[in-house]
Amino acid sequence: MSVRGRVAPSQTPSRIPGTVLAYLALTKPRVIELLLVTAIPAMLLAQRGTVNPLLIVNTLIGGMLAAGGANALNCVADADIDKVMKRTARRPLARAAVPTRNALVFGLVLTAGSFLWLWWTTNLLSGLLALATIAFYVFIYTLLLKRRTSQNVVWGGAAGCMPVMIGWSAVTGTIQWPALVMFAIIFFWTPPHTWALAMRYKDDYKAAGVPMLPAVATERQVTKQILVYTWLTVLATLALALATGWLYAAVAVVAGVWFLAMAHQLYAGVRAGEPVKPLRLFLQSNNYLAVVFCALAIDSAIGLPHLF
Protein backbone atom coordinates (compact mmCIF):
# COMPACT_ATOMS: atom_id res chain seq x y z
CA MET A 1 0.00 0.00 0.00
CA SER A 2 1.29 3.47 -0.88
CA VAL A 3 1.86 6.22 1.65
CA ARG A 4 -0.98 8.12 0.02
CA GLY A 5 -3.30 5.18 0.55
CA ARG A 6 -2.39 4.90 4.22
CA VAL A 7 -2.96 8.61 4.97
CA ALA A 8 -6.31 9.10 3.26
CA PRO A 9 -8.46 6.99 5.63
CA SER A 10 -7.22 8.90 8.69
CA GLN A 11 -8.00 12.27 7.11
CA THR A 12 -11.68 11.66 6.48
CA PRO A 13 -12.76 11.20 10.13
CA SER A 14 -10.81 14.30 11.17
CA ARG A 15 -12.61 16.44 8.59
CA ILE A 16 -16.08 15.30 9.58
CA PRO A 17 -16.09 16.68 13.15
CA GLY A 18 -14.64 19.96 11.86
CA THR A 19 -17.42 20.29 9.30
CA VAL A 20 -20.09 19.45 11.86
CA LEU A 21 -18.67 22.01 14.27
CA ALA A 22 -18.59 24.63 11.51
CA TYR A 23 -22.29 24.13 10.77
CA LEU A 24 -23.04 24.17 14.49
CA ALA A 25 -21.14 27.45 14.80
CA LEU A 26 -23.37 28.96 12.10
CA THR A 27 -26.31 28.60 14.50
CA LYS A 28 -24.49 30.63 17.21
CA PRO A 29 -25.23 28.26 20.13
CA ARG A 30 -24.45 30.93 22.73
CA VAL A 31 -27.24 33.10 21.35
CA ILE A 32 -29.65 30.16 21.57
CA GLU A 33 -29.12 30.13 25.34
CA LEU A 34 -31.47 33.13 25.52
CA LEU A 35 -34.21 30.86 24.21
CA LEU A 36 -33.73 28.39 27.06
CA VAL A 37 -33.53 31.11 29.70
CA THR A 38 -36.73 32.90 28.66
CA ALA A 39 -39.04 30.44 26.90
CA ILE A 40 -39.46 27.93 29.74
CA PRO A 41 -40.36 30.56 32.40
CA ALA A 42 -42.84 32.07 29.95
CA MET A 43 -44.49 28.67 29.51
CA LEU A 44 -44.64 28.10 33.26
CA LEU A 45 -46.18 31.54 33.86
CA ALA A 46 -48.75 30.91 31.13
CA GLN A 47 -49.75 27.64 32.81
CA ARG A 48 -49.31 28.90 36.39
CA GLY A 49 -47.86 25.55 37.30
CA THR A 50 -46.45 22.40 35.77
CA VAL A 51 -46.36 22.23 31.97
CA ASN A 52 -46.42 18.97 30.02
CA PRO A 53 -42.70 18.11 29.66
CA LEU A 54 -43.26 16.94 26.08
CA LEU A 55 -44.71 20.34 25.18
CA ILE A 56 -41.66 22.06 26.67
CA VAL A 57 -39.29 19.79 24.73
CA ASN A 58 -41.19 20.28 21.47
CA THR A 59 -41.27 24.05 21.93
CA LEU A 60 -37.56 24.19 22.68
CA ILE A 61 -36.72 22.04 19.66
CA GLY A 62 -38.78 24.29 17.41
CA GLY A 63 -37.31 27.39 19.01
CA MET A 64 -33.75 26.15 18.61
CA LEU A 65 -34.38 25.32 14.96
CA ALA A 66 -35.77 28.83 14.45
CA ALA A 67 -32.88 30.54 16.24
CA GLY A 68 -30.36 28.38 14.41
CA GLY A 69 -31.95 29.15 11.05
CA ALA A 70 -32.04 32.88 11.72
CA ASN A 71 -28.43 32.93 12.88
CA ALA A 72 -27.21 30.89 9.90
CA LEU A 73 -28.94 33.26 7.48
CA ASN A 74 -27.49 36.19 9.42
CA CYS A 75 -24.00 34.72 8.94
CA VAL A 76 -24.61 34.53 5.19
CA ALA A 77 -25.70 38.18 5.03
CA ASP A 78 -22.86 39.39 7.28
CA ALA A 79 -20.02 37.31 5.83
CA ASP A 80 -18.31 40.36 4.34
CA ILE A 81 -18.15 42.34 7.58
CA ASP A 82 -17.39 39.26 9.70
CA LYS A 83 -14.10 38.97 7.79
CA VAL A 84 -13.15 42.51 8.80
CA MET A 85 -14.04 42.35 12.50
CA LYS A 86 -11.58 40.61 14.83
CA ARG A 87 -14.38 39.38 17.08
CA THR A 88 -16.12 37.56 14.20
CA ALA A 89 -13.19 36.68 11.93
CA ARG A 90 -13.29 33.03 13.03
CA ARG A 91 -16.91 32.47 12.07
CA PRO A 92 -17.37 29.67 9.52
CA LEU A 93 -18.11 31.80 6.46
CA ALA A 94 -15.47 34.39 7.33
CA ARG A 95 -12.79 31.68 7.23
CA ALA A 96 -14.43 29.76 4.36
CA ALA A 97 -15.07 26.66 6.50
CA VAL A 98 -18.54 26.32 4.92
CA PRO A 99 -19.51 27.28 1.34
CA THR A 100 -21.91 30.23 1.25
CA ARG A 101 -24.49 28.30 -0.77
CA ASN A 102 -24.44 25.44 1.72
CA ALA A 103 -24.88 27.85 4.63
CA LEU A 104 -27.85 29.47 2.88
CA VAL A 105 -29.52 26.11 2.25
CA PHE A 106 -28.77 25.06 5.83
CA GLY A 107 -30.43 28.20 7.20
CA LEU A 108 -33.49 27.80 4.98
CA VAL A 109 -33.89 24.14 5.95
CA LEU A 110 -33.75 25.02 9.66
CA THR A 111 -36.25 27.83 9.08
CA ALA A 112 -38.74 25.56 7.32
CA GLY A 113 -38.15 22.86 9.91
CA SER A 114 -38.89 25.20 12.81
CA PHE A 115 -42.20 26.31 11.34
CA LEU A 116 -43.34 22.80 10.49
CA TRP A 117 -42.19 21.37 13.82
CA LEU A 118 -43.93 24.00 15.94
CA TRP A 119 -47.10 23.80 13.84
CA TRP A 120 -47.17 20.03 14.16
CA THR A 121 -46.23 19.70 17.85
CA THR A 122 -47.72 22.88 19.37
CA ASN A 123 -49.99 25.08 17.27
CA LEU A 124 -50.07 27.21 14.14
CA LEU A 125 -49.62 30.50 16.02
CA SER A 126 -46.30 29.38 17.48
CA GLY A 127 -45.08 28.29 14.06
CA LEU A 128 -46.08 31.60 12.49
CA LEU A 129 -44.41 33.56 15.28
CA ALA A 130 -41.17 31.65 14.68
CA LEU A 131 -41.38 32.33 10.95
CA ALA A 132 -42.07 36.03 11.55
CA THR A 133 -39.13 36.22 13.96
CA ILE A 134 -36.71 34.81 11.40
CA ALA A 135 -38.00 37.11 8.66
CA PHE A 136 -37.71 40.15 10.94
CA TYR A 137 -34.20 39.27 12.08
CA VAL A 138 -32.85 38.60 8.61
CA PHE A 139 -34.66 41.19 6.50
CA ILE A 140 -35.42 44.04 8.91
CA TYR A 141 -32.46 43.90 11.28
CA THR A 142 -29.61 42.34 9.27
CA LEU A 143 -30.33 43.66 5.78
CA LEU A 144 -32.16 46.93 6.50
CA LEU A 145 -31.16 48.36 9.87
CA LYS A 146 -27.78 47.02 10.92
CA ARG A 147 -25.67 49.00 8.46
CA ARG A 148 -27.89 52.09 8.31
CA THR A 149 -28.70 53.32 11.81
CA SER A 150 -27.05 53.55 15.22
CA GLN A 151 -30.35 52.40 16.72
CA ASN A 152 -30.08 49.07 14.90
CA VAL A 153 -30.06 46.87 18.00
CA VAL A 154 -32.98 48.76 19.56
CA TRP A 155 -35.41 47.74 16.84
CA GLY A 156 -33.57 44.66 15.66
CA GLY A 157 -33.54 43.36 19.20
CA ALA A 158 -37.25 42.64 18.91
CA ALA A 159 -36.34 39.32 17.30
CA GLY A 160 -34.59 38.22 20.48
CA CYS A 161 -37.76 38.90 22.47
CA MET A 162 -39.86 36.40 20.55
CA PRO A 163 -39.01 33.19 22.50
CA VAL A 164 -41.28 34.36 25.33
CA MET A 165 -44.11 34.94 22.86
CA ILE A 166 -43.59 31.53 21.25
CA GLY A 167 -43.42 29.83 24.65
CA TRP A 168 -46.60 31.55 25.83
CA SER A 169 -48.51 30.80 22.64
CA ALA A 170 -47.40 27.15 22.71
CA VAL A 171 -49.21 26.77 26.04
CA THR A 172 -52.26 28.99 25.53
CA GLY A 173 -52.66 29.34 21.76
CA THR A 174 -52.96 33.11 22.31
CA ILE A 175 -50.89 36.18 23.23
CA GLN A 176 -51.85 37.92 26.49
CA TRP A 177 -50.49 40.92 28.37
CA PRO A 178 -47.91 39.08 30.55
CA ALA A 179 -46.26 37.82 27.35
CA LEU A 180 -46.08 41.39 26.07
CA VAL A 181 -44.47 42.55 29.33
CA MET A 182 -41.87 39.78 29.09
CA PHE A 183 -41.28 40.88 25.50
CA ALA A 184 -40.70 44.43 26.80
CA ILE A 185 -38.23 43.22 29.43
CA ILE A 186 -35.97 41.64 26.82
CA PHE A 187 -36.55 44.49 24.36
CA PHE A 188 -35.30 47.09 26.86
CA TRP A 189 -32.52 44.80 28.14
CA THR A 190 -30.99 44.26 24.69
CA PRO A 191 -29.51 47.76 24.07
CA PRO A 192 -27.49 48.03 27.32
CA HIS A 193 -26.37 44.42 26.93
CA THR A 194 -25.25 44.89 23.31
CA TRP A 195 -23.86 48.41 23.60
CA ALA A 196 -21.69 47.42 26.57
CA LEU A 197 -20.06 44.78 24.36
CA ALA A 198 -19.87 47.18 21.42
CA MET A 199 -18.00 49.72 23.58
CA ARG A 200 -15.25 47.13 23.90
CA TYR A 201 -15.18 46.40 20.16
CA LYS A 202 -16.10 49.80 18.72
CA ASP A 203 -12.99 49.88 16.51
CA ASP A 204 -14.15 46.63 14.91
CA TYR A 205 -17.49 48.19 14.05
CA LYS A 206 -15.80 51.31 12.66
CA ALA A 207 -13.55 49.19 10.45
CA ALA A 208 -16.54 47.23 9.15
CA GLY A 209 -18.61 50.36 8.54
CA VAL A 210 -21.36 49.29 10.95
CA PRO A 211 -22.82 52.35 12.76
CA MET A 212 -23.25 50.66 16.12
CA LEU A 213 -23.90 53.42 18.67
CA PRO A 214 -20.51 53.19 20.46
CA ALA A 215 -18.78 53.49 17.07
CA VAL A 216 -20.49 56.77 16.18
CA ALA A 217 -21.26 58.44 19.53
CA THR A 218 -19.23 59.54 22.53
CA GLU A 219 -18.90 57.23 25.53
CA ARG A 220 -20.94 59.69 27.58
CA GLN A 221 -23.81 59.56 25.07
CA VAL A 222 -23.64 55.76 24.93
CA THR A 223 -23.61 55.23 28.69
CA LYS A 224 -26.46 57.71 29.12
CA GLN A 225 -28.60 55.64 26.75
CA ILE A 226 -27.46 52.46 28.50
CA LEU A 227 -28.69 53.98 31.75
CA VAL A 228 -32.08 54.90 30.28
CA TYR A 229 -32.68 51.42 28.88
CA THR A 230 -31.50 49.79 32.11
CA TRP A 231 -34.13 51.76 34.03
CA LEU A 232 -36.78 50.76 31.49
CA THR A 233 -35.72 47.12 31.84
CA VAL A 234 -36.05 47.15 35.61
CA LEU A 235 -39.41 48.95 35.49
CA ALA A 236 -40.69 46.33 33.04
CA THR A 237 -39.62 43.51 35.38
CA LEU A 238 -41.53 45.20 38.20
CA ALA A 239 -44.61 45.54 36.00
CA LEU A 240 -44.57 41.77 35.47
CA ALA A 241 -45.00 41.35 39.24
CA LEU A 242 -48.70 42.09 38.65
CA ALA A 243 -48.95 38.56 37.23
CA THR A 244 -46.61 36.75 39.65
CA GLY A 245 -46.13 35.84 43.29
CA TRP A 246 -43.93 37.40 45.97
CA LEU A 247 -40.81 35.37 45.13
CA TYR A 248 -40.44 36.79 41.64
CA ALA A 249 -41.27 40.31 42.87
CA ALA A 250 -38.59 40.17 45.57
CA VAL A 251 -35.92 38.88 43.20
CA ALA A 252 -36.88 41.47 40.56
CA VAL A 253 -36.38 44.28 43.08
CA VAL A 254 -33.03 43.04 44.40
CA ALA A 255 -31.65 42.12 40.97
CA GLY A 256 -32.94 45.40 39.56
CA VAL A 257 -31.08 47.45 42.17
CA TRP A 258 -27.91 45.49 41.36
CA PHE A 259 -28.30 45.97 37.59
CA LEU A 260 -28.99 49.68 38.00
CA ALA A 261 -25.96 50.07 40.26
CA MET A 262 -23.70 48.63 37.57
CA ALA A 263 -25.16 50.88 34.87
CA HIS A 264 -24.86 53.97 37.08
CA GLN A 265 -21.28 53.03 37.95
CA LEU A 266 -20.39 52.80 34.25
CA TYR A 267 -22.03 56.15 33.50
CA ALA A 268 -20.39 57.85 36.49
CA GLY A 269 -16.98 56.50 35.50
CA VAL A 270 -17.31 57.88 31.98
CA ARG A 271 -18.51 61.27 33.26
CA ALA A 272 -15.52 61.44 35.60
CA GLY A 273 -13.12 60.55 32.80
CA GLU A 274 -12.00 57.39 34.60
CA PRO A 275 -11.10 54.06 32.94
CA VAL A 276 -14.23 51.92 32.70
CA LYS A 277 -14.90 48.24 32.05
CA PRO A 278 -18.05 48.01 29.90
CA LEU A 279 -17.44 44.31 29.31
CA ARG A 280 -18.29 43.75 32.97
CA LEU A 281 -21.77 45.17 32.43
CA PHE A 282 -22.16 43.01 29.33
CA LEU A 283 -21.31 39.83 31.23
CA GLN A 284 -23.33 40.70 34.32
CA SER A 285 -26.36 41.65 32.23
CA ASN A 286 -26.53 37.99 31.19
CA ASN A 287 -26.57 36.97 34.84
CA TYR A 288 -29.24 39.56 35.59
CA LEU A 289 -31.60 38.25 32.94
CA ALA A 290 -30.97 34.65 33.98
CA VAL A 291 -31.68 35.42 37.65
CA VAL A 292 -34.92 37.27 36.89
CA PHE A 293 -36.30 34.59 34.58
CA CYS A 294 -35.19 31.72 36.83
CA ALA A 295 -37.06 33.40 39.68
CA LEU A 296 -40.07 33.68 37.39
CA ALA A 297 -39.84 29.98 36.56
CA ILE A 298 -39.67 28.92 40.21
CA ASP A 299 -42.43 31.32 41.26
CA SER A 300 -44.71 30.06 38.48
CA ALA A 301 -43.90 26.37 38.98
CA ILE A 302 -44.70 26.60 42.68
CA GLY A 303 -47.89 28.44 41.83
CA LEU A 304 -47.51 31.18 44.43
CA PRO A 305 -50.58 33.44 44.76
CA HIS A 306 -50.54 36.66 42.75
CA LEU A 307 -49.50 39.74 44.66
CA PHE A 308 -52.29 41.81 43.10
From Swiss-Prot:
Pfam families: UbiA. Keywords: Cell membrane, Heme biosynthesis, Membrane, Transferase, Transmembrane, Transmembrane helix. One of its GO terms (molecular function) is protoheme IX farnesyltransferase activity. Converts heme B (protoheme IX) to heme O by substitution of the vinyl group on carbon 2 of heme B porphyrin ring with a hydroxyethyl farnesyl side group. Disulfide bonds: none annotated. The keyword Magnesium does not apply. Its EC number is 2.5.1.141. It is found in: Cell membrane. It is a multi-pass membrane protein. It comes from the Bacteria. Gene3D superfamilies: UbiA prenyltransferase. One of its GO terms (cellular component) is plasma membrane. The chain crosses the membrane at residues 31-51, 53-73, 102-122, 124-144, 149-169, 170-190, 240-260, 288-308. NCBIfam families: cyoE_ctaB, PRK04375.1-2. It comes from Mycobacterium avium (strain 104). Carbon 2 of the heme B porphyrin ring is defined according to the Fischer nomenclature. This is Protoheme IX farnesyltransferase. The keyword ATP-binding does not apply. GO terms for biological process: heme O biosynthetic process.
